[in-house]
């Protein structure tokens, strides 16, 4: 959804007299996986932090409204793969997004039926590693694996004590060799190698 989010954030920023910043899809891809505070520092370095966060909250509000109407761009065969995964594994989402983003995405694309639970810092105020731990504890998981695409995801998995699969088709790289997949359709086999079948 990076292109859609870029459009919505640019609309929000256009209404703010403090900045003439516009956001591209490439910008958004570089921000993916980062907390809102970090994005504010990167995107609006000339603006003092409290005002930067106020502007980011405006971006969030416009983004939610935009995504409710337009959704995001899905990976090819995403729903088919989610269905296949959900037959063997319980699926969860842990993301560094704001509160409401996951719900909006799942509702627009009618994908909620494949997921058991989700968490984000917008809901807890906590970092990704803590939110991974919350999901594991809240759902009484004795085995889990986290699929992510950037170094911060690997760091969060390490901190939470959860194995990691690098989604190499995503937005970033990681600093060491870990199990990796080149497309979403490879996640099932990678998870099965780490977890076995959980259902």
Q: For the regions a protein language model found, what residue spans apply to each?
A:
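Conserved phosphate-coupling serine/threonine residues in phosphotransfer and NTP-handling enzymes
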Residues: 95-97
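Active-site neighborhood of HAD-like aspartate-dependent phosphohydrolases
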Residues: 1-26
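Metal-dependent phosphoesterase signature
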Residues: 41-79
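Helix-loop "lid/cap" segments that line or gate small-molecule binding pockets
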Residues: 10-14, 35-49, 105
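Conserved donor sugar-nucleotide recognition element shared by glycan-biosynthetic enzymes
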Residues: 5, 36, 74, 128
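Short, acidic loop-to-helix structural element flanking the phosphoryl-transfer center
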Residues: 65-93, 103, 129
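Short helix-capping segments at alpha-helix termini
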Residues: 15-21, 47-51, 110-114
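Asp-based, Mg2+/Mn2+-dependent phosphohydrolase catalytic module
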Residues: 99, 103-199
């Amino acid at each position: 959804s990076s292109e859609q989010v870029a459009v919505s954030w640019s609309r929000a920023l256009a209404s703010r007299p403090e900045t003439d910043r516009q956001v591209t899809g490439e910008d958004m891809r570089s921000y993916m996986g980062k907390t809102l505070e970090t994005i504010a520092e990167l995107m609006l370095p000339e603006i003092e932090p409290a005002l930067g966060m106020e502007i980011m909250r405006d971006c969030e509000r416009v983004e939610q409204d935009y995504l409710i109407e337009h959704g995001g761009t899905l990976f090819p065969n995403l729903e088919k793969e989610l269905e296949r995964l959900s037959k063997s594994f319980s699926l969860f989402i842990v993301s560094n997004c704001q509160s409401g983003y996951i719900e909006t995405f799942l509702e627009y694309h009618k994908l909620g039926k494949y997921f058991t639970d989700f968490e984000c810092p917008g809901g807890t105020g906590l970092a990704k590693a803590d939110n991974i731990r919350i999901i594991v504890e809240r759902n009484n998981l004795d085995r889990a694996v986290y699929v992510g695409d950037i170094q911060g995801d690997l760091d969060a998995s390490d901190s939470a004590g959860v194995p990691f699969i690098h989604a190499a088709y995503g937005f970033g790289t990681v600093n060491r060799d870990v199990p990796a997949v080149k497309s979403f359709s490879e996640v099932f086999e990678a998870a099965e190698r780490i977890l076995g079948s959980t259902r």
